[in-house]
């Protein structure tokens, strides 16, 4: 039995709750990928995964779906195959597209979710998703910035209004206030962002965000733990 060890920890009643739960994850990259896999390994029975992107060589340093063999493939397709290889009985809905306020019905019309995981990078899309979750009274947890960070022990779960240091959280906090949204559970880091180094020999004027294997992954696992605990009231 796949979930025998989990049942020993949380009990059969809670395991059944997870089996009958449907979670939708927006963004299956560095944070969302680890969150997704942890959710289904914990026993979530139905999952929807949303991501328009393909696996890139630059994802190899931190994303659970990134392998030499998956470069160039749709992230949702790679993730779906991986999840079903863990639990063949899992129900997976794949959305290889970008979420926006213009295609809300694709994800929310005639669908019910136990929880929403927001691992979106783009601020406008992030805000629109949070607004929809609040309008529909669906529990949601949002990932704040994990780039340019080195210390995973500085990550914590809190309400958006109690966050500090994180530049993304500052923007989200301000914009949610403008939208009249007072509460939002987030995972964020209290670590001051590092200034990214210039790559040797690079002529690019744009400075990309630095990242490492163990910070986004930890954020994803924290998100998964919060979802599981909330669904089971643990």
Across the structure, where does each feature detected by a protein language model lie?
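N-terminal charged helix/coil linker that caps or initiates catalytic domains
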Residues: 1-24
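Glycine-rich phosphate/adenylate-binding loop
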Residues: 19, 111-114, 120-125, 135-136, ...
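Conserved N-terminal Rossmann-fold NAD(P)-binding element of oxidoreductases
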Residues: 25-27, 50
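Hydrophobic/small residue at the entry helix of a nucleotide-binding pocket
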Residues: 31-32
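Conserved S-adenosyl-L-methionine
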Residues: 41-46, 135
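Glycine-rich phosphate-binding loop and adjoining beta1-alpha1-beta2 segment
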Residues: 44, 49-87
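Short amphipathic alpha-helix with an adjacent loop that forms part of the alpha/beta core around
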Residues: 102-113
């Amino acid at each position: 039995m796949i979930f025998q060890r989990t049942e020993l920890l949380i009990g059969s009643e809670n395991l059944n709750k997870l089996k009958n739960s449907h979670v939708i994850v927006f963004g299956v990259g560095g944070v969302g990928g680890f969150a997704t896999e942890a959710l289904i390994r914990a026993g979530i029975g139905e999952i929807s995964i949303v991501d328009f992107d393909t696996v890139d060589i630059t994802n190899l340093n931190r994303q659970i779906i990134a392998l030499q063999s998956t470069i160039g493939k749709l992230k949702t397709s790679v993730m779906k195959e991986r999840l079903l290889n863990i639990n063949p009985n899992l129900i997976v809905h794949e959305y290889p597209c970008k979420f926006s306020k213009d295609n809300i019905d694709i994800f929310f019309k005639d669908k019910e979710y136990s929880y929403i995981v927001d691992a979106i990078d783009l601020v406008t899309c992030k805000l629109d998703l949070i607004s929809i979750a609040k309008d529909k009274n669906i529990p949601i947890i949002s990932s704040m910035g994990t780039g340019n960070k080195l210390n995973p022990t500085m990550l914590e779960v809190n309400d958006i209004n109690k966050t500090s240091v994180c530049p993304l959280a500052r923007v989200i906090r301000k914009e949610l206030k403008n939208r009249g949204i007072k509460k939002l559970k987030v995972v964020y880091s209290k670590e001051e962002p590092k200034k990214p180094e210039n790559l040797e020999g690079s002529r690019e004027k744009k400075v990309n965000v630095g990242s490492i294997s163990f910070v986004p992954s930890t954020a994803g696992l924290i998100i998964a733990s919060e979802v599981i605990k909330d669904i089971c009231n643990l």
